[in-house]
């Protein structure tokens, strides 16, 4: 049940954050049970928003709250045994059953309701992003699964494209292993098993069509020795194919005938050569490889030159910055040296102006500083005086407390002296304690003596009972054997059986009387204990309270009657 409890606690924590998920159902208090059940009921039905979520202090109100929650659970469809005791005295098994039912009744569209509630106020960027992610996930979960080789067609149809404009372009370099595994080496087989992409991955890389690619590969394997022909473009639509198959004018028929003758002549010349399409493709691939190598080498050279030019550019820019800074300084010096007397006068005037400005600022600062220093000194003096006054007050309080404590100490000393004089001496106490101990020991010895006597008596009774039983069995056997032949022995046997039954009845009566006397003594002890509890006085107090409450009720009734009479008269 631990996993079930964890699930229940997780759901309750999502509904009400005040319920910790680390709690256990066995440790649920009545207040926590009421809060959890009320939260679940409010989530189930929006009309139950006024349900109490906590238990009041009064016992009557507690019963009312528990009965209301029990009725609401029954109205929700709970068929188990539920009442106020389920909430006030919770049982883990019943509580687990109730919470599981309420969690199953929770609405599944709580998230959509939260989204609808959020539209009433502007959403932040984070909330908008979370909402978009949630909507995207919902849409993806509702979409049906489509195989990998059909996803391109499905995506184009979802965009509104017609099936006639779909391009069935084949993958020309489809890599398919041979059907016979003996034709492949161990390395090739390992490559196809672990690293080689499958047909779906090869065709889905660049939007190739799977069926067209497989048919193209099959044609290459079957008709690879035939001469190459101009392939018909598979991307043409059905209207174009119909237009090509049905010419509209005789000029077109003549041109098509001329083209057919040229094609036949080219086919005748092609049959004379022995080159196959695969060899031509190999040659083209080789030429392309050489061209790519040349282009790569050229690219490396160009990149190296570009890096060198960038380095030169950075160095030139740095040199330019240094030269510009030096040039500015030289220009300033040249301006100063061009008219030395005038510039020196200007500098002296500037120095004098700055000195005058500094003096004025210093004077202003001193004028502003003096009142601040005065206020600071006054505040410090006031603070010190306040602290001194606080210390003096605390000293006076401590002196008063010391005087009061000393007086109390003197009073206690005097009371202690008087108590020691009035109380009995220590020897009297020890004598009384020894007497109590002697009495206790004497009582203990008497109790042990009574117990020993009862044990001895019990042993004697058991021995006598065993002897009587043996004697009865022996006499019973003798009389039974002689009763077969003698009438007097038969009568004696009957009298013996009657005597045995009477004796057993007497023993039972004695044991019953003993039990009754024991119960009587126990009841007497209980009665004495109840007498010590002053039950009569308590009953009298309760009856007095009842009489006072009745009098109060009668007074209220008379007041109500007077008010009614006043209303009727008025």
Swiss-Prot record:
Feature: compositional bias, Polar residues: 248-257
Annotated region described as Disordered, given as residue ranges: 110-129, 234-280
Any one GO MF annotation of this record: cullin family protein binding
Pfam families linked: CCDC22_CC, CCDC22_N
Keyword Coiled coil: yes
Sections of the chain in a coiled coil: 308-471, 529-570
Disulfide bonds listed in the record: none
Low complexity: bias regions: 265-276
GO biological process, one term: positive regulation of ubiquitin-dependent protein catabolic process
Alphabetical keyword list: Coiled coil
Keyword Hydrolase in annotation: no
Similarity section: Belongs to the CCDC22 family.
Protein name: Coiled-coil domain-containing protein 22 homolog
